[in-house]
Amino acid sequence: LGDVYKRQWFECKVKYEKTMENGLVKKVNEPYLVDALNFTEAESRIIEEITPFMTGVFEVSDIKRARYAEMFEAPGDDSADKYFRAKLIFITLDEKSGKEKKTSQNVLIQAGDLRDAVKRLDEGMKGSMMDYTIASVTETAIMDVYHYEVRNKKAGEDKPEYEA
């Protein structure tokens, strides 16, 4: 299918009224990360994913591309309840000019705190052949990450309407 159909990450902000721990209701605008082909699919997917968790009215207030080269998640680790964005600088040698070339990439890390995020990043990068330095690691406001999954279709759903 080529790059035209390459899945990518979208940060979707969802605005709704949330009941806080003290019992007060507050309007919040929370970001979620969704794996999708385009903006239209990202909106439809975030609505599908969060609807079961919403009790009142909500709206998708913003969608933007999120460029993450890699994601290091911590499935099954309940203490890893935050997402951190790390900017990595890769140093390569330009063979023609002989000069060092620096390129940067963002990665997303699920971790409990900053120290844990750096540890998980280093573990995740162990297999990398490229030299890198960590330029920054910052906590994000991302609430959750939704990967693309192929849903099982019911019998007959894949038939065109005129054949049904």
Regions found by a protein language model. Give the residues of each.
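A cross-kingdom feature marking solvent-exposed beta-strand/loop segments within repeated
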Residues: 18-35, 52-55, 99-107, 127-129, ...
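Short, small-residue-biased leader/transition segments that mark boundaries at the very start
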Residues: 1-5
